Amino acid sequence: MAAVGANATLLTNTKSTVEPVRPLANFPPSVWGDMFLSFSLDNSKMEEYAKAMEKPKQEVRRLILDPTMDSNKKLSLIYVVHRLGLTYMFLKEIEGQLDRLFEEFNLEDYVDVDLHTISINFQAFRHLGYKLPCDVFNKFKNNDSNAFKESIASDVRGLLGLYESAQLRVKGEKILDDASAFAETKLKSLVNTLEGSLAQQVKQALKRPFHQGMPMVEARLYFTNYQEEFSKYDSLLKLAKLHFNYLQLQQKEELRIVSKWWKDMRFQETTPYIRDRVPEIYLWILGLYFEPKYSLARIIATKITLFLVVLDDTYDAYGTLEELRLLTHAINRWDMRAMSDIPEYIRPFYKILLDEYAELEKQLAKEGRLKSVIASKEAFQDIARGYIEEAEWTNSGYVASFPEYMKNGLITSAYNVISKSALVGMGEVVSADALAWYESHPKILQASELISRLQDDVMTYQFERERGQSATGVDSYIKTYGVSEKEAIEELKKMIENAWKDINEGCLKPREVSMDLLAPILNLARMIDVVYRYDDGFTFPGKTLKEYITLLFVDSLPM
């Protein structure tokens, strides 16, 4: 969660004692205030939704298992179910169907199939981890020039499907690299000529492809923009509405819980310089996993990430270098006796931090899951060390080499704290073996981590310069490789693009671990894209994040 675009302000005191000079950031206030504190959960309404879902759920299950449905219709149905965020309800049935269809796959069967249908089939397989060959798109290229045929440029639905399919590519799939560029160019040239739902579909894909979006928001937008795709299935339409409204009630209650906790902790009084972003942080964590079973996990991860906001803003927008050195030492000691060594203003935070983790350790130890809490705590200590390194660089005017910057920057991106804290409340999914795999720092984790750092840097480097903060990856890349600012940004974007390919590869079968463990890694990269693609959406949440929070927690779907 990088820092801010506000101009630095100096604080001095006219009294005989001169106060330290502090880089106050004047963060924008919360967009929401106490709005979500007043929510009152109607348990009877949740029970009503849950009961009402049973019949359409059984009907959708029968559709998925229908042996008379041809393969293209079956794959289209599975794709729609996935886009609506309902896959987890029917995962066993869907994988059973895809296992059979994947085994029966024959490239010759696609000779007479149109681009839109092929694209839907391709996405249905790839999203669920089946590596359908990208050769299915070869027939849309010219044999002589190897370029995509201009004749498909008028097939808007086909182009849209091709563009969405290309986002699922892995390294070495040049045809999908070409497909992405070709389809994007053609769609941009056509978008202003389109009308109705198709225009909205294209605009949304160009703004952010489905694969790189927040699952719950993408499901909500799909429901609105693609109703003609699934309205023929009454049961699916009804289930999607009930499901969204059920989840909304559960999630608004979770948001109320963390909002009350935040208010009770009085952080806005004891550390008034910080960003007040409770709904935005909850949204971020919801982006990692929205399924009902992860309710406790979301609450835990949101609280820890809110701790991180206080820490980040203290290092970045308030503390003096000497104060930050003392705070870093105290966090590494992790001992209440260290409280007397740190500035008075940060002592309430320090006590609450240690108390909350102690309670988590007590709770998770009973379940035999203490290691996940320890991993989260150690990540928190790591980021404090990373923050002080950045503060020392800023103080001395030092610009690190790009490799040196990335070594520390991957830590200060906050990825490690958020991702490990997301594991704490996930239950049996996070076994000892799963945690060991996570700690081995596999390629998919490295890729998601890199996106978290560089997407942030590409969007915020100018703001950081204005505030006189430590050099970002853009600055370090320019210094290390002697390139222009434009060239540096282009190179970092290429690194981000390649990292997405590694994430896509890591989600394909056979997988090293279950998709339950991989999904938060994939989804954290998605949330970084949501927050930082167009602006610093966390510091200035009045655009994208406000729209998302309204979609998910304010507006319901009419039944």
Swiss-Prot record:
It catalyses: (2E,6E)-farnesyl diphosphate = (+)-(R)-germacrene A + diphosphate. Binds 3 Mg(2+) ions per subunit. Mg(2+) 1 binds at residues 312, 316. It comes from the Eukaryota. Mg(2+) 3 binds at residues 456, 460, 464. Mg(2+) 2 binds at residues 312, 316. It is found in: Cytoplasm. The keyword tRNA-binding does not apply. It is an enzyme of class 4 (lyase). A motif (DDXXD motif) lies at residues 312-316. Its main location: cytoplasm. The Asp-Asp-Xaa-Xaa-Asp/Glu (DDXXD/E) motif is important for the catalytic activity, presumably through binding to Mg(2+). Monomer. This is Sesquiterpene synthase TPS3. It comes from Xanthium strumarium (Rough cocklebur).
